[in-house]
């Protein structure tokens, strides 16, 4: 039984922490792997350093680098795992590009979708968990946790508000694969809600 489950959300939504905790619960009963974008494979990790830690770059260059990393990650890690019948939990996927580069950067959602559809070749997630939190709360968490801020973290509040608007538009248009989880609650509640959402999906397939 394979399933491709992606996690989306604005900066400070707690995605990485939630995925880790959900993974350690799921692995007791399912053949599951956890991965991330950009990254997940050596080439992807090198691209991650460029787009998240490097200097400012042309917005279309940024979008193409994310798409290139995505393709390499799919071919080397995600697709083989799905063929082996695994459950794949992925921290970010195509919807991040649509929300960040397509909407917030202003390239255009459909333009970025076309670029990424070439990269993913039809492989959309079976289920996408959206961790819903406001830009203000996300920013406060990043500052409070003193985490290392990447290039996207350092964008202004208006940019992050646009990211959320982009996600809302995507979810409205593709509501069948999205499940929204309230991430503005205690972490253990977010983890439990996310875990139960995934279990309900897996029990149906």
From Swiss-Prot:
The protein's matches in InterPro entries, at most eight in alphabetical order, are given as: P-loop_NTPase (IPR027417), Thymidylate_kin-like_dom (IPR039430), Thymidylate_kin_CS (IPR018095), Thymidylate_kinase (IPR018094)
Binding residues annotated for ATP, in chain numbering: 9-16
What's a GO cellular component annotated to this UniProt protein?
cytosol
Q: Does the keyword Transferase apply?
A: yes
What highest taxon heads this organism's lineage? Bacteria
> Which key words tag this protein in UniProt?
ATP-binding, Kinase, Nucleotide biosynthesis, Nucleotide-binding, Transferase
What does the record list as GO biological process? dTDP biosynthetic process; dTTP biosynthetic process; dUDP biosynthetic process
> Catalysed reaction(s)?
dTMP + ATP = dTDP + ADP
Q: Which Pfam families match?
A: Thymidylate_kin
Top EC class per UniProt? transferase
Q: Which GO terms describe its molecular function?
A: ATP binding; dTMP kinase activity
Protein EC: 2.7.4.9
What HAMAP family does the entry give? Thymidylate_kinase
Extract the PANTHER family matched here. Answer: THYMIDYLATE KINASE, UMP-CMP KINASE 2, MITOCHONDRIAL
Q: Which family does it belong to?
A: Belongs to the thymidylate kinase family.
Question: Main role?
Answer: Phosphorylation of dTMP to form dTDP in both de novo and salvage pathways of dTTP synthesis.
User: Which protein is depicted?
Assistant: Thymidylate kinase
**Gene encoding this chain?**
tmk
């Amino acid at each position: 039984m394979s399933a491709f489950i992606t996690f989306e959300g604005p900066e400070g939504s707690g995605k990485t922490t939630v995925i880790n905790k959900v993974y350690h619960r799921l692995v007791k009963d399912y053949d599951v792997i956890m991965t991330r974008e950009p990254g997940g494979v050596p080439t992807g990790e090198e691209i991650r350093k460029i787009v998240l830690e490097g200097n400012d770059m042309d917005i279309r260059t940024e979008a193409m680098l994310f798409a290139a990393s995505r393709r390499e990650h799919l071919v080397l890690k995600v697709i083989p795992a799905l063929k082996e019948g695994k459950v794949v939990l992925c921290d970010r996927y195509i919807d991040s590009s649509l929300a960040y580069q397509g909407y917030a950067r202003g390239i255009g959602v459909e333009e970025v979708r076309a670029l990424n559809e070439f990269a993913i070749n039809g492989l959309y997630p079976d289920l996408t968990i959206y961790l819903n939190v406001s830009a203000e709360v996300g920013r406060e968490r990043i500052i409070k946790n003193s985490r290392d801020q990447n290039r996207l973290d350092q964008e202004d509040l208006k940019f992050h508000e646009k990211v959320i608007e982009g996600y809302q538009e995507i979810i409205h248009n593709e509501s069948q694969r999205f499940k929204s989880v309230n991430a503005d609650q205690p972490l253990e509640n977010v983890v439990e809600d996310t875990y139960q959402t995934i279990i309900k999906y897996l029990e149906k397939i």
